[in-house]
Amino acid sequence: MKVAIIGATGYGGIELIRLLEQHPYFSIASLHSFSQVGECITNVYPHFQNVLVHTLQEIDVEEIEKEAEIVFLATPAGVSAELTPKLLAVGLKVIDLSGDFRMKDPFIYEQWYKRAAAKEGVLREAVYGLSEWKRSEIQKANLIANPGCFATAALLAILPLVRSGIIEEDSIIIDAKSGVSGAGKTPTTMTHFPELYDNLRIYKVNEHQHIPEIEQMLAEWNRETKPITFSTHLIPISRGIMVTLYAKVKREMEIEQLQQLYEEAYEQSAFIRIRMQGEFPSPKEVRGSNYCDMGIAYDERTGRVTIVSVIDNMMKGAAGQAIQNANIVAGLEETTGLQHMPLYL
C-alpha cells in the first residue's frame, strides 16, 4: 500500500520515513514539504543516503491522490485542519499527528490551542487513535487523530483504573517528563543546549494542550471523572517520556489485585509491557521502540496507587503509534513493521 508524508522534514516526519522505509507492506510514494520543495531528502538529512531517494514535493492533493492511499500529516497545529478536508474529499485516508482533530468540542480546542478549530463536520468524523483502546473504531476510520505523546503515556497508565471505577474521580495527578525532541525541531531559548544541559524545566503549568485531550478520553470511560492535575517538565535527553501518575482508591486494595487488573487489561496488547511487582521502567528501556512499559505500586498508608509509564515520544508517542494505527486500518497485525528492540545505549 502506497503512502505519502506531508511535513516530512520535521522530527515526526523523519521518524515516519525511517519506519515506513523498513515496513514490509507500506511503501513511500511521496514526501512533501512546505519550505524545502525540490530538495532531495538526503540533502536535508544525510543519514538517509543510500537508503532512499526522494525529492521533496509541493502539496498537490490531486497528485497525491494518484499515488497514495494513506496520507500521514506530520504538520504543525492549524495546517492539518486546512489540508484534511481536501484529502478526505478525494478518498484518501488520513492519519494526523497534530492536535487539530483530537478534540470533539471546537470551543475547547480554541480555548487550549489559541487558534480556530477545524470544521465541526470533520471533527465529528475523526477517531481518536489510542490504538489499544480504540481498535474497532480505528479499523473503520477515514481520519485518525493520533494522540499526543504525553496523553498516550498518561492514558495508557490511567484507563484501566478509570474503567474499573476503583479510584476517586477527583484524585488524578499526573507528573510528566519529556526529552527535548518532544518540543519539536524549531529551537527555542528553553531547548537551547546551555539552558537545558544539567538542568530541567517545568513548562505550561496547568495550561498544557494535552490536558483536555486526556480529560475527554477519561470521560468516555467514566462520566464522573473530574479535572486532572497535570504538569510537564523538559529534561536533558533527546527522546523519551516518563509519566508518574497518582490516584486514590475508593476502598482498600491489594497490590496483587492492581497487578492483575493491568495484566488483564493489556493481555492482548503486544506493545504494553507490565513490569513485575516492585519493578519500575525507565525511558532508556523503550527508546527506539513502540513499547509502553509500566510499573505499579500501592501505598496502604495513603490509599494511593502510583503508576509509572514510559514511552519513546517519537515512537509510541508519535510515528510508531501512527503506523500502528495504519496497520489496523489496513487489516494488518498491529506489530507489522514495528517489532524493533529498544535501543538501550
Swiss-Prot record:
Entry-linked SUPFAM superfamilies: Glyceraldehyde-3-phosphate dehydrogenase-like, C-terminal domain, NAD(P)-binding Rossmann-fold domains
CDD domains associated with the record: AGPR_1_C, AGPR_1_N
Function: Catalyzes the NADPH-dependent reduction of N-acetyl-5-glutamyl phosphate to yield N-acetyl-L-glutamate 5-semialdehyde.
Entry annotation: catalytic residues: C149
Protein name as it appears in the record: N-acetyl-gamma-glutamyl-phosphate reductase
Coiled coil: none
Predominant place of localization: cytoplasm
GO biological process annotation, one example: L-arginine biosynthetic process
One GO CC term, this protein: cytoplasm
EC number of this enzyme: 1.2.1.38
Pathway(s) annotated for this protein in UniProt: Amino-acid biosynthesis; L-arginine biosynthesis; N(2)-acetyl-L-ornithine from L-glutamate: step 3/4
Subcellular location: Cytoplasm
Reaction(s) this enzyme catalyzes, per UniProt: N-acetyl-L-glutamate 5-semialdehyde + phosphate + NADP(+) = N-acetyl-L-glutamyl 5-phosphate + NADPH + H(+)
Family that this chain belongs to: Belongs to the NAGSA dehydrogenase family. Type 1 subfamily.
Keyword set, alphabetical order: Amino-acid biosynthesis, Arginine biosynthesis, Cytoplasm, NADP, Oxidoreductase
Class in the EC hierarchy, top level: oxidoreductase
Stored InterPro entries: AGPR_AS, AGPR_type-1, NAD(P)-bd_dom_sf, NAGSA_dehydrogenase, Semialdehyde_DH_NAD-bd
GO molecular function, one term: N-acetyl-gamma-glutamyl-phosphate reductase activity
